[in-house]
């Protein structure tokens, strides 16, 4: 008794094995990508939330691809292998469907990436605006700091100048007061000789020059000392009454020139 056995075409067996191998490879690839995604997520959880960079954008893209592949893997697990006749029309139809699906997935990914890029662009513009504002504030503060420093220097110089001016004015006033007091003292105690006695009349007549007071002689010696400190000597003139000169020399108020006795200078009491 013979049994009817249904023979399976070798090409059909080969096609089924190819589909199974493809599914296993796809599952293996998805598992590897899933493991990589978990590692990346663990690293990101340790780093914390930061502004997206190029690496973060690529990571987001990989995560979306992983989700798509996971969904596709789930569909593959639910599907049962079917023996499909591998003719040209069927393959063309399947290829179109796969390409259409891939196109939809890529358009979705592209839309997501464009949305993230727009957000990053807005964040960049906002950060750039903040940076420009901070730079303007910094420039303004630098200008104010420079103005304050210049003002401080100006105020310091002005204050010093005013203080020196006040001191000079006070010294001049004290000098005038001192000269007036000295002049009054000298006029009272060392007046010019009067032509009341014959001896004085003869001494005055012998000199044709007009005699000057002791105060005027001292002022001349003082001015010479401060105006020409390197040559403070004054030549004795006919208008200098000789007793005045002897008085100044005797009490050490004036000194003769070591080489020219006709010149005298004031003793440098200030040195």
Swiss-Prot record:
Its main location: nucleus. It is found in: Nucleus; Chromosome, Centromere; Chromosome, Centromere, Kinetochore. Residues 11-44, 102-151 form a coiled coil. It comes from the Eukaryota. Highly expressed in testis. The keyword Nucleus applies. Keywords: Centromere, Chromosomal rearrangement, Chromosome, Coiled coil, Kinetochore, Nucleus. GO terms for biological process: chromosome segregation; kinetochore assembly; positive regulation of transcription by RNA polymerase II. GO terms for cellular component: inner kinetochore; nucleus. Component of the CENPA-CAD complex, composed of CENPI, CENPK, CENPL, CENPO, CENPP, CENPQ, CENPR and CENPS. The CENPA-CAD complex interacts with the CENPA-NAC complex, at least composed of CENPA, CENPC, CENPH, CENPM, CENPN, CENPT and CENPU. May interact with Sox6. Component of the CENPA-CAD (nucleosome distal) complex, a complex recruited to centromeres which is involved in assembly of kinetochore proteins, mitotic progression and chromosome segregation. May be involved in incorporation of newly synthesized CENPA into centromeres via its interaction with the CENPA-NAC complex. Acts in coordination with KNL1 to recruit the NDC80 complex to the outer kinetochore. Belongs to the CENP-K/MCM22 family. This is Centromere protein K. It comes from Mus musculus (Mouse). The gene is Cenpk.
């Amino acid at each position: 008794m013979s049994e009817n056995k249904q023979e399976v075409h070798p090409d059909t067996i080969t096609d089924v094995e190819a589909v199974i191998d493809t599914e296993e490879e796809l599952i293996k690839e998805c598992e590897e990508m899933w493991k990589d995604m978990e590692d990346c997520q663990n690293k990101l959880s340790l780093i914390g939330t930061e502004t997206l960079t190029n690496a973060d954008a690529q990571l987001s893209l990989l995560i979306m691809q992983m989700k798509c592949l996971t969904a596709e893997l789930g569909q593959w697990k639910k599907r049962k292998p079917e023996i499909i006749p591998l003719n040209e029309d069927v393959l063309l139809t399947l290829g179109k469907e796969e390409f259409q699906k891939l196109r939809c997935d890529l358009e979705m990914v592209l839309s997501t990436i464009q949305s993230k890029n727009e957000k990053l662009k807005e964040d960049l513009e906002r950060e750039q605006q903040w940076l420009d504002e901070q730079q303007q504030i910094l420039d303004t503060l630098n200008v104010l700091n420079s103005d304050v420093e210049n003002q401080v220097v100006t105020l310091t110089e002005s204050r010093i100048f005013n203080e020196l001016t006040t001191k000079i004015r006070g010294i001049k006033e004290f000098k005038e007061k001192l000269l007036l007091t000295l002049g009054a003292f000298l006029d009272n105690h060392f007046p010019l000789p009067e032509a009341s006695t014959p001896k004085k009349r003869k001494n005055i007549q012998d000199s044709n020059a007009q005699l000057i007071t002791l105060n005027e002689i001292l002022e001349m010696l003082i001015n010479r000392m401060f105006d020409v400190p390197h040559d403070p000597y004054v030549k004795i003139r006919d208008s200098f009454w000789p007793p005045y000169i002897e008085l100044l020399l005797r009490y050490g108020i004036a000194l003769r020139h070591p080489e020219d006795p006709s010149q005298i200078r004031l003793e440098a009491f200030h040195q």
